[in-house]
C-alpha cells in the first residue's frame, strides 16, 4: 500500500496514496526494511511481511485491481516469472506445437506453462509433465493428474540426475515420440540433458530460471547433433500484468484444486533431497562461470 508520494515523483502519475500496488521490479534492487515476517508459503515461494520499500521513478509499479486477498498469491507467482511466461507464449503461438513437455520443479509454475502450451494450439496439444522422483514422496501422481486435468495428458516421476535413464523411461512411455517444445523449470543438474534428449530436431527448449544450466544445454544439443532453438529467461514485459491476470482467470479451478493438494503435502521434507541434487558436481553454486545467489 502506498504510504507517501513525494511531490518530485515523476513515475506512474495515476497512482495515489492508499492504493494497493504490485512492484514488478525485483525487490533485491530496492532499499527495503523488513519489520516482521508473518508467514511463509513454501508452495508459492512467497512470504507475508511488514516493512517499507522506497520506490524510485524507474520502478515499474501497477495498481492491484484483481485477485486480492488469498487469490493474490496466484497473480504474484505469475508475475514473478512475467517475462518468461510472455516470451514462451509468443514463441509457442508461432510454433503451434502438437506435443510439449514440461520439466517442472514446482506444480504451480508447471501449470502456468501447461496452460500457455494448451492455448497456443487449442485442442491439439499433448502436454506431458515430468518431475524429479524426489517429489513423488510428497505429491501423489493421481492427485496431480486430478489437479491438472486436461492440462497434462500424462505425468512422469523420474530421476533427473540420471538423464539418460530418465529419457529411456519417457521414450518407452511415449512410444518413442519426441516433443516439439520442452520447458525446463528445474535446476537439478541433468534436467538440461533430458530436455535436449527428448526434444525433436528443429524443436525448441525453453529455460526459465537463473540456474537451469542454459549454456550446458547448448553443448548437449550439439553433442546430440540436433538443431534446437533455445529460448532463455526474459525480464520485464510491459504487458505482464494484463497477461498474468488473463492467465490466472483461465486457471482458477485448477489452481484451487492444486491448492488442496499442496496444503496436504509436506513441502519441507523434500527440500533436503532436492538441494542435494542441485549441488551435485559443482557444489560451490558456480555453474558455467556465472555465480548466482541462493
Where are these regions (language model features)?
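Adenosine-nucleotide cofactor-binding segment
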Residues: 118-190
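Short helix-loop-beta connector
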Residues: 92-100, 176, 201
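Conserved S-adenosyl-L-methionine
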Residues: 96, 118-128, 201-202, 226
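C-terminal hydrophobic helical "lid"/dimerization subdomain
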Residues: 237-294
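Hydrophobic beta-strand signal
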Residues: 21-23, 101, 206, 231
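NAD(P)H dinucleotide-binding glycine-rich loop of Rossmann-like/cofactor-binding domains
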Residues: 22-97
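Glycine-rich phosphate-binding loop and adjacent beta-alpha segment
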Residues: 186-250
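Glycine-rich beta-strand-centered segment in the early N-terminal region that forms part
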Residues: 1-29
Amino acid at each position: 500500500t502506498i504510504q507517501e508520494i513525494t511531490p518530485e515523483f515523476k513515475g506512474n502519475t495515476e497512482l495515489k496514496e492508499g492504493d494497493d500496488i504490485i512492484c514488478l521490479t525485483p525487490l533485491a534492487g530496492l532499499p527495503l526494511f523488513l519489520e516482521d515476517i508473518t508467514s511463509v508459503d513454501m508452495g508459492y515461494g512467497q512470504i507475508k511481511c511488514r516493512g517499507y520499500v522506497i520506490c524510485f521513478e524507474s520502478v515499474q509499479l501497477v495498481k492491484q485491481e484483481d485477485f486480492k486477498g488469498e487469490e493474490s498469491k496466484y497473480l504474484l507467482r505469475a508475475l514473478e516469472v512475467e517475462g518468461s511466461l510472455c516470451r514462451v507464449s509468443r514463441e509457442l503461438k508461432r510454433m503451434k506445437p502438437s506435443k510439449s513437455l514440461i520439466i517442472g520443479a514446482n506444480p504451480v509454475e508447471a501449470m502456468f506453462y501447461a496452460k500457455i502450451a494448451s492455448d497456443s494450439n487449442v485442442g491439439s496439444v499433448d502436454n506431458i509433465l515430468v518431475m524429479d522422483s524426489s517429489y513423488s514422496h510428497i505429491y501423489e501422481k493421481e492427485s496431480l493428474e486430478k489437479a491438472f486435468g486436461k492440462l497434462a495428458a500424462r505425468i512422469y516421476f523420474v530421476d533427473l540426475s540420471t538423464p539418460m535413464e530418465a529419457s529411456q523411461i519417457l521414450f518407452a512411455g511415449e512410444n518413442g515420440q519426441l516433443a516439439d517444445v520442452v520447458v525446463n523449470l528445474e535446476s537439478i543438474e541433468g534436467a538440461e540433458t533430458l530436455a535436449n534428449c527428448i526434444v525433436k530436431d528443429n524443436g525448441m527448449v525453453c529455460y526459465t530460471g537463473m540456474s537451469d544450466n542454459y549454456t550446458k544445454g547448448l553443448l548437449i544439443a550439439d553433442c546430440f547433433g540436433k538443431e534446437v532453438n533455445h529460448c532463455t529467461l526474459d525480464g520485464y514485459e510491459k504487458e505482464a500484468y494484463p497477461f498474468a491476470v488473463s492467465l490466472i482467470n483461465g486457471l482458477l479451478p485448477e489452481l484451487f484444486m492444486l491448492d488442496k493438494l499442496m496444503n496436504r503435502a509436506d513441502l519441507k521434507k523434500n527440500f533436503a533431497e532436492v538441494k542435494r541434487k542441485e549441488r551435485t558436481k559443482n557444489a560451490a553454486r558456480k555453474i558455467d562461470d556465472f555465480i548466482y545467489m541462493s
